[in-house]
Structure formats: structure tokens, C-alpha cells
């Protein structure tokens, strides 16, 4: 195991490819399909230009001029950040709005973070967490009123627990 924890492995499926493209668009400023293709290859996903073009079209990805003049792919309003805007800060602001009204408690337990919500809200909270690329978080499992956030190690769970609590308290 590396110092940063286990790497995310994806099956060779269309859904996994679309998920990888979505994550790449959320975490990088992608200016060309060849740049996106290289990022996908680094993740072990080989894709033809034609398939990549169809995938981007299906995702409604469009090239948008950013504030600095760069033309990059974006998907909806939660896509690539413009110059001076950190994707992490924007993601935190979105998460804070959701978590503020829905999180009732947060606790770290081993490599897990346990997040309690009102009845029926856990699935929504988990999906908000899953949509953000959060370092050290592998994924979530949600029940009716509890979300388990699976982290790469115990220390990450403690730091992510504190972070989620601070977002919920804003």
C-alpha cells in the first residue's frame, strides 16, 4: 500500500469510464480531448477519440471560456473552476449548504466517519459527499439516518470527521 492509500480501481465499463471523465472534469482544467485521454490512460482507461467525443456529448460537456481566457470543458455549473476559484472551496461551499441543515452528529471510528442525519436524509448527504473529490475518502455507505464515510486510514478519518463537522457548523 502506498503512503497516500489505496488507488481507486475502475472496472472496464461504460459507467466507470463516464465516472472517471466526470471526476477528471471536476478536478482538472481540461482544454482538449487529447489531454482528457491522457488523464484517462493514466487511470488505466483506454478510450478512442470517437468514444470520448460521444461521452462528452452525452454528459453535455461544452467548451467554456474561463475568466483567464482559457477555453476548457465544463459540465453544468459544478464543472471546472475559473481562475482564482478553487474547486475545493466551491465544493466545500456546496457541501456546507447541504450539511448545515442535515447533519446531527459526526464521529470518527477507526478508518470510518459516522455521520448522523434526520430520518431519510442519509442517502442525500452521502451523494453530496460522493460527488466531491475528497482526498483520503474512498466512498460512502448510507442507510436511513446514518452515513459511513470510508477513509484510507484512521488519521484521515479523524481529519475528515473534524472537517465535515466544521462544514456542518457553518
From Swiss-Prot:
Pathway: Amino-acid biosynthesis; L-arginine biosynthesis [regulation]. Pfam families: Arg_repressor, Arg_repressor_C. GO terms for biological process: L-arginine biosynthetic process; protein complex oligomerization; regulation of arginine biosynthetic process. GO terms for cellular component: cytoplasm. Keywords: Amino-acid biosynthesis, Arginine biosynthesis, Cytoplasm, DNA-binding, Repressor, Transcription, Transcription regulation. Its main location: cytoplasm. Regulates arginine biosynthesis genes. This is Arginine repressor. It comes from Bifidobacterium longum subsp. infantis (strain ATCC 15697 / DSM 20088 / JCM 1222 / NCTC 11817 / S12).
